[in-house]
Amino acid sequence: MESSPSSPQPTQSDPLAVFPQRTLEPADIAVLVLYFLFVLAVGLWSTVKTRRDTVKGYFLAGGDMVWWPVGASLFASNVGSGHFVGLAGSGAAAGLSVTAYEFNGIFSVLMLAWIFLPIYIAGQVTTMPEYLRKRFGGSRIPITLAVLYLFIYIFTKISVDMYAGAIFIQQSLHLNLYLAIVGLLAITALYTIAGGLAAVIYTDALQTLIMLIGALTLMGYSFAAVGGMEGLKEKYFLALASNRSGNSSCGLPREDAFHIFRDPLTSDLPWPGILFGMSIPSLWYWCTDQVIVQRTLAAKNLSHAKGGSLMAAYLKVLPLFIMVFPGMVSRVLFPDQVACADPEICQKVCSNPAGCSDIAYPKLVLELLPMGLRGLMMAVMVAALMSSLTSIFNSASTIFTMDLWNHLRPRASERELMIVGRVFVLLLVLVSILWIPVVQASQGGQLFIYIQSISSYLQPPVAVVFIMGCFWKRTNEKGAFSGLILGLLLGLVRLVLDFIYPQPRCDQPDERPAVVRDVHYLYFSMILSSVTLVTVSTVSWCTAPPTQEMVSRLTWFTRHDPIVLKEQVPSATPVPVTVSQNGTPEASSTNIQFEIVQENTSKTHSCDMTKKQSKVVKTILWLCGMESKGKEEPPSRADPVIVSLEEIPLVKTLLDINLIVCISCAIFLWGYFA
């Protein structure tokens, strides 16, 4: 068994034998403490700096973010601890084919800024369900989608990041899992609740820098340990566990490990599925997912949003080099643990009989890095976990507040929405903690593939509805709802079948039904997209077309339509979410006047009460962005909403040139590694 010369030889009887019983050195602890102080300082600075007492200020960071924090936040929101653990684990187990998801994301994030975002800006939307409410009318589709988004966030994103973070924290630090994660969640929730999206974006920018420094450092150590890329290509195919059964194919490296495009029938990621089946969930994630779109909507203008997307697209090249290749290096250096093939030994090594490839990245951190740098990489993993959780907390809070709560209480004041949004973050924290035992009990042998298979069952119908709504004016509510429900039902059936008939281990016969065994999840994504597309088109053709209000400024072809009424009306109050669905904005002005009068009276009462408020109450109100400022409030409710799609010609030209360069780089990478 190959191991670091400085580490003690682990014994197979110890369930944590894969990691030496190291304790953090003082330098490691100092780095971790400095990191947490940095994050809290940046979070509190952005909390003081930005306006948090309006819907736009809290949920969209005031709409004045410049390109670089937007780009950093896009990358940090996407690359969580699940990426570090999952991508490196998939690289160790099956080679670099999983990189296709990252390269696919390059095109999708650029499509967001150049194609989808102009439609969202023209339509003046805060959330994705709100766009569908304006585009199709009614409440069936937005409510269904809001619930689905929250389901996906809580039970896939939070659970996956929790699992990945748990692997790193528990296995490497030997800390109490609940204590560590509760502490992380407490810090994460504090600046999310206090600062809103601005705090999340600024801390994401800091954490992106830390992630890149730490991950690039580990990449250098990894390649040095195996003799560079040539050494990796030679040694990877020899990386076999010494205790592997000689007559078994289990645990063997794949012959196509260094290729992205693989056999269309027998491989783990068939190339037609990569080209077509993978693109639909990728479009959902980058172009219609609240977590991602919310960051670009917070940009100052369309040019800054494009700049941020370009920055994220360039950064998406890095996961292959800082995650996938190091995962493959980990298999070369530690084959007995990372490449274990015997279920009993895997159970002893990492408490997972399905395989231990997911320990590849933390194994590298603890074995290769010297004192101090080990603490830096601990901070990197914590940064990845926290940046993902803050993104999910803020975006889920936005959806719940603006789409579900606003539907239940259409006359809710701005103050009430601010309180509800922050309380919902606390509920998410509670759900996250309660979800930890479920994550611990789940099988994580193929963490990243698990994420993508779930995505392929639930996301294609939603993506098709958005695409049809944005690019076909004839699409109506009945067609979109029919396609969405049929697609989700089919996806849920396949999801349930996958849970009932889990994939057998390598040494077991595959007795699953043919629809589960023979239809790859990427092929199922293609089938699901086609069924949804045909349903939406057919029902829309056979029913009445949408009204002009539901099309104007809400599709690609109508985004430049003239503005019918004053555009400041929607931004003055959250009420237009319910008003616009009926296409009768004439009645909105009286509603807004009523709401402002109502809130002014409530604020007068609150001002009278400030003399009796304790310091604790004042602190809580400050955290919630509702400190008293006098009776002249609220002029802040009339924040301007960006509706202009105009760009400075020189800036637009530079961005378009960068777009061509970025796409060319992506095509080259596809071709080189295909």
Curated annotation (Swiss-Prot):
InterPro entries, from UniProt?
Answer: Na/Glc_symporter_sf, Na/solute_symporter
Q: Where in the cell is it found?
A: Membrane; Apical cell membrane
Q: Which GO terms describe its biological process?
A: apoptotic process; myo-inositol transport
Regulation acting on activity, per entry = MI transport activity inhibited by D-chiro-inositol (DCI), phlorizin (Pz) and sodium (Na(+)). Insulin increases D-chiro-inositol uptake.
Q: In the UniProt record, does the keyword Membrane occur?
A: yes
Keywords for this protein: Apoptosis, Cell membrane, Ion transport, Membrane, Sodium, Sodium transport, Sugar transport, Symport, Transmembrane, Transmembrane helix, Transport
Q: Which reaction does it catalyse?
A: myo-inositol(out) + 2 Na(+)(out) = myo-inositol(in) + 2 Na(+)(in); 1D-chiro-inositol(out) + 2 Na(+)(out) = 1D-chiro-inositol(in) + 2 Na(+)(in); D-glucose(out) + 2 Na(+)(out) = D-glucose(in) + 2 Na(+)(in); D-xylose(out) + 2 Na(+)(out) = D-xylose(in) + 2 Na(+)(in)
Molecular function in Gene Ontology: D-glucose:sodium symporter activity; myo-inositol transmembrane transporter activity
User: Which stretches are Extracellular in the membrane topology?
Assistant: 1-27, 78-102, 162-180, 230-272, 330-374, 440-446, 501-518
- What is the protein's major site of localization? membrane
Which residue intervals are topologically Cytoplasmic? 49-56, 124-140, 202-208, 294-308, 398-418, 468-479, 540-653
- Keyword Membrane among UniProt keywords: yes
For membrane topology, the record states:
Multi-pass membrane protein
What function is annotated for this protein?
Answer: Involved in the sodium-dependent cotransport of myo-inositol (MI) with a Na(+):MI stoichiometry of 2:1. Exclusively responsible for apical MI transport and absorption in intestine. Can also transport D-chiro-inositol (DCI) but not L-fucose. Exhibits stereospecific cotransport of both D-glucose and D-xylose. May induce apoptosis through the TNF-alpha, PDCD1 pathway. May play a role in the regulation of MI concentration in serum, involving reabsorption in at least the proximal tubule of the kidney.
What is the name of the protein in this document?
Sodium/myo-inositol cotransporter 2
Species assigned in the record: Sus scrofa
